[in-house]
Each structure stands twice: as structure tokens, then as C-alpha cells.
Amino acid sequence: MPGGQRCLGPRWNPKKCSVLHVKRGVQQEDNDSIKLDESFVIQSFKQQSHYKFLGVLENTKQEDLLALECASKEYLKRLSVIWSSPLSDVNKVTASNQYALPVLSYLMPTQRWPMSKLQRIDREVRKVMVENGGKHPARSSALLYLPRAVGGRGMKSVETAYKVTKIKTALKIHGSTDPTVKLVKNWDENSASKGRHSVYTIL
């Protein structure tokens, strides 16, 4: 609602609105639009359409894989710009960690992504580096992700960043004394015991 949006910052824009028909929690294939006046009509929201809320693609449910696909394209695009630039190696790694990776890390706390997809993105990252002379094809990939203090290059792995984010989230929920968060903890533990998705089993 217009009043409820003020605390979030965005302004109410009727041109970006759609009508969504839901019956018993299921989106209906209803093409009825809402006519506000003679010159303005709010169109019905199609089943295959998507919208962004706080930068995350959604439909009637979270589109985790679609969000990962879009974010990974932007991540690799930024990496290509960084590693084809005349920056020094140290600055390229810093830019990769602080400018490119946040495209994905912003979404990690709320998304559920397969490890195989994240490993593929890490391989694409190394491919970009090789193509731009930032890494020798035969050089150890493990050294790439070690800190510079111990002989590595300090690059952050997407897979590792995702795991760290999920572990921190699980620890925060598990150690919280907030009554509301305890309800989340109990629900997650119950889900884990039944073999369903949970913050404790997502890895």
C-alpha cells in the first residue's frame, strides 16, 4: 500500500502495478484488469511474468534459479571488465571481491542454490581470468583462493561465500534468544528431522 512503502523508500507508481488474482493460495488465470479512470488501466499479472522486490526476481514464489542466472551474468560481466582492465593484480582481486561478488552475495541469505551451479560459476570466473592473462591454465586453483598472507591471491570463491553465509545464518538462528526467532529455529529443526529443506541442511 502507498503508506506502507514510505518506510522502505520507494515511491508509489501506479504504472508499475499489476493485478494478481489468487484463490486459495493459487494464482488464477484471470485476465481481468482494473480500470482506474478513462485513461489508466492496471493490467492483470500473467503467470509467467516476474517482478522485482528489493532487487530479487519473484513470481508467486521465489525464483531462486532465475535469480541466480541473472545475478551470475552480471557478476561475470563485471569480472570481464575488471580482468581486462590495466589494474594491478592486487587491485583486480580487490575489485572482484568488493565490486563483482556483492551482486551474488546480496541474494545469498534468502536464496537456495545448488552447489553444482555455484561450482560452475567459479569455473567461469577462472576461465575469464585465463582469457585475460590473469591466471595460467595449469596453475593451481587452490592457490587462487588462499589469502595473500600465506602465498595465495586472496580471491573469494562463490561456493565458499555461499556456504559461509548459510552457516552464519544457521548459527545466528540457533543462538538467538528472541522468542520469534526461536519459532523459526523449531520449524527448521522439525523440517530437518523430516528430510525437508532447512537452514541446517541446505548445504
Regions found by a protein language model. Give the residues of each.
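Mobile genetic element proteins and their domesticated derivatives, centered on retroelements
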Residues: 1-5, 19, 55, 75, ...
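Short, conserved micro-motifs composed of acidic
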Residues: 3-6, 10-49
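Short aromatic/hydrophobic-glycine micro-motifs
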Residues: 9-10, 56, 134, 155
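Basic, alpha-helical interaction scaffolds
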Residues: 39-115, 133-134, 167-183
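Short amphipathic alpha-helical coiled-coil/interface segments
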Residues: 118-129
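Extended C-terminal regions of large enzymes
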Residues: 121, 136-203
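Long, amphipathic alpha-helical regulatory blocks in the mid-to-C-terminal portion
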Residues: 127-137
